[in-house]
Amino acid sequence: MSDRVNVTVDGIAVEVEPGTTILQACEEAGVEIPRFCYHERLSVAGNCRMCLVEVEKAPKPVASCAMPVAPDMVVNTQSDSVKSAREGVMEFLLINHPLDCPICDQGGECDLQDQALGYGVDSSRFEDNKRAVEEKEMGPLVKTVMTRCIHCTRCVRFATEVAGVPEIGAIGRGEDMEITTYLEASLESEMSGNVIDLCPVGALTSKPYAFTARPWELRKTETIDAMDAVGSNIRVDVRGREVMRILPRDNEAVNEEWLSDKSRFVWDGLNTQRLDRPYLRVDDKLQATDWPSAFDAIAARLEAGSGQVAALAGDLVCTEGQFALKSLMEKLGSPHLDCRQDGAKLSGPRANYLFNTGIAGIEDSDALLLIGTNPRLEAAVLNARIRKRWLAGNFPIAAIGQPTDLTYDAEFIGAGPQTLAELVEGKHGFADVLSKAERPMLILGQGALARSDGAGVFAQALALAQKTGMISDDWNGFNVLHTAAGRVGGMDVGFLPGEGGRDRNGIIEGCKSGDISTVILYGADEIDRDELGGAFVIYIGSHGDRGAHGADVILPAAAYTEKQAIFVNTEGRAQMSERAAFPPGDAREDWKIFRALSDHLGATLEFDTVDALRTVMFELAPHLARLDELVPAGVPEKPVADVTELDAAAFAPVLKDYYFTNPIARASATMAACAEAKRARAKAIGGTGTDG
């Protein structure tokens, strides 16, 4: 016997689960119900009344978002009483609305516009003065015009429930009610920009985007974010060659429909500080040149150089580019290459460096240990998923590292490897919590891996996972959280030291000793130029940032929004980014640069098109061809390399400043404004204003 409930909506019979609301049942039947306050990812408020429907035998229309279905319920959404009720609700909503659509940034994609047209009337009977509300200061990202607010409270519920930073709320009652930040302070959440998408009117809009474009002027491209290793699905809106804004796309398995502030607002950095032509250092000054001259200088250096050549890949580079550079290095006979520019000690089979549980799999876990990571800053969207699971209850969380506000209750049980060793030995109480859990998981961050004893920390974490039952036939709770969008793809294609090759630290030592005379920095901007000694530096990247400043030759490349390329997120999901705009000037796609350079060096690569490159790459890593899939990676194994003795030092935060983690972010005026606002908040309460 089925326990599902039979409901009839406008003559359409549907079966739904008990507890389903009338609104959800209507959606199951394919009937659209207007709404302002209701959102499927937020709690039910039931305060806009736009979703009124008629239920048979009920004395008056009911709010469909808040009313659960009953057996054999008959719902009518198109009766005269329903239409009249919706017209009345819309008239009340518009009583105090300023009707300033021509100067509102929400115009053209506004729920209030659409529903007023579909369900409202063409005139108002209100003749008194409208209410006016002072604007609220919410920082450099969110612009407010609170006179437009209809008090749906979506922003309040998002800040409290999803972001976990209850900094938006309502004060006053009735007509005097106002949405505010209480203290007129800048929003602190790394997810605050999502209130812009949630706002059904023009009360909360994007401050950097204000008065720049209308939605119908923009060319929209669905692609992938590269600001962190989550791989959030995004939409890039472009006018001409200029990126105008970035919005989230729905992907239940990755980012649901949320987006971090850095991913959303970094777009202005794509339009500034760009490298648009090759440069060559002459008499200690960088001078613009052409591609053949730049290639000639590189060829001459490699022929004359007494040492070896090495390559380092940065955080924002794509998988195809790393495979092309790796292939070129093989042609040149050099095993010295590394995609771990932070020096993280990761190696071995694929399961050793993936978030094996999967981002969506967090919701199936029942205990969590964080080791050397602050997911709130390193992966804000993933952190929201952890908070979602925590809100569901029965989810103990412990952390080893620097105490901080993670937006959920976590017990900070220690600061460094010593605590991890105690857990492995069973001397700490949380070891029992993990052992008793059915699906425990741990998240190992780069703050624990990018240290001299990173391999030892990894081995201890793996031992803990094995001892507490985190790894079984149907569950893998051992997870590595990356911070770089290009890291997993680089490791998948083997952009790692070959036999006898040097890793990142070894390359730096080789430069100092003179054993390595030439270094290719492929988007590697976090390497200190002084550490490279007298080595000849070739920089391939999109922005005039740290890597370019110290380079001897600069080759301009495309940014992540300017090429079709594969990025592999921290859970090992290969996703294809699409080109939303063209690179500026003479800049070229990464793989094309390496292909042309190989010709000039007499080490021609065997592919002439990106499809041919991918064919060869897929032979090496077949899972990369399975886009948008989580391919099983097996079981993590103890590193083959010698495990160093554990250092007693505490795990340090891997991000020193959340808003300045890469060249695009450092070129963004919006990110600079965010960093300044954060410093101002910290100064007001006696902090430092950095994340370290």
What are these regions (language model features)?
Residues S2-G19, Q24-E27, R35, H39, ...:
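N-terminal export/assembly segments and adjacent metallocofactor-ligating motifs
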Residues V44-R49:
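A short, glycine/Asx- and small/polar-enriched loop/turn
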Residues A58-K60, I471:
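A cross-taxa feature marking solvent-exposed loop/turn segments within ectodomains of secreted
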Residues Q341-L630, R681, I685-G692:
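Non-catalytic alpha/beta scaffold blocks inside enzyme catalytic domains
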Residues D611-G692:
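Long, low-complexity segments enriched in small/aliphatic residues
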